[in-house]
């Protein structure tokens, strides 16, 4: 079974001084870089996903800005595929599924940002497209959320979404556990 790494939205706007800084993006990016190194060393396929905002739907990832660029810690090599998306689901209106099929990919190892948006939406869609998924949770990051007067800390958001994916949609692991 061909396994590919899917690195989602590890982009400058999610880091300190970016327009949508997350909680601990550096730690997630560092772990994603370890996964990237592993996949490159084994010659397995690597796919990067880059979100570019269209219109005024979000205040970050605007075209032709430094914030939209893929972070230097996981910058794609020339031979690696970059999928551009405009919605949280990396399969929606993109050629991701076709590119994965061209490579014979059946299983995805997913990492990136944000846990509660693009990671969640993409993993659920991947399963609907017939892929087996693993999510490397400490190579993902998110942010604190609010609903009415309730504040939900980023750590709680992250683990709630990882727990929701674990089992039916994915096997959720740490970087260390995956690399063993």
Curated annotation (Swiss-Prot):
Record InterPro entries: Isochorismatase-like_dom (IPR000868), Isochorismatase-like_hydrls (IPR050272), Isochorismatase-like_sf (IPR036380)
Classification via CDD domains: nicotinamidase_related
Keyword Mitochondrion recorded: no
UniProtKB keywords: Hydrolase
Enzyme class: hydrolase
One function term, GO molecular function aspect: hydrolase activity
Highest taxon, organism lineage: Bacteria
Pfam families: Isochorismatase
Gene3D superfamilies, A to Z: Isochorismatase-like
Claim: Endoplasmic reticulum is one of the keywords in the record: no
Enzyme Commission numbers on file: 3.-.-.-
Protein family membership: Belongs to the isochorismatase family.
PANTHER family: ISOCHORISMATASE HYDROLASE, PEROXYUREIDOACRYLATE/UREIDOACRYLATE AMIDOHYDROLASE-RELATED
Protein name: Uncharacterized isochorismatase family protein YddQ
């Amino acid at each position: 079974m061909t396994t590919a790494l899917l690195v989602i939205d590890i982009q400058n706007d999610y880091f300190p001084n970016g327009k949508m800084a997350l909680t601990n993006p550096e730690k997630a990016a560092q772990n994603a870089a370890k996964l990237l190194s592993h996949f490159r060393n084994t010659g397995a396929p690597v796919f990067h996903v880059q979100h570019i905002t269209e219109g005024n739907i979000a205040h970050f990832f605007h075209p032709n800005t430094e914030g939209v660029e893929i972070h230097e810690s996981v910058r794609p090599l020339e031979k690696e595929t970059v999928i551009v998306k405009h919605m949280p689901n990396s399969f929606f209106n993109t050629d991701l599924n076709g590119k994965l099929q061209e490579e014979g990919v059946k299983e995805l190892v997913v990492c990136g940002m944000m846990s509660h948006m693009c990671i969640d939406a993409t993993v659920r869609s991947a399963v609907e497209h017939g892929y087996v998924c693993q999510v490397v949770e400490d190579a993902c990051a998110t942010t604190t959320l609010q609903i009415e007067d309730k504040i939900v800390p980023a750590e709680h958001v992250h683990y709630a979404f990882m727990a929701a994916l674990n089992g039916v949609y994915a096997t959720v692991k740490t970087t260390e556990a995956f690399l063993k």
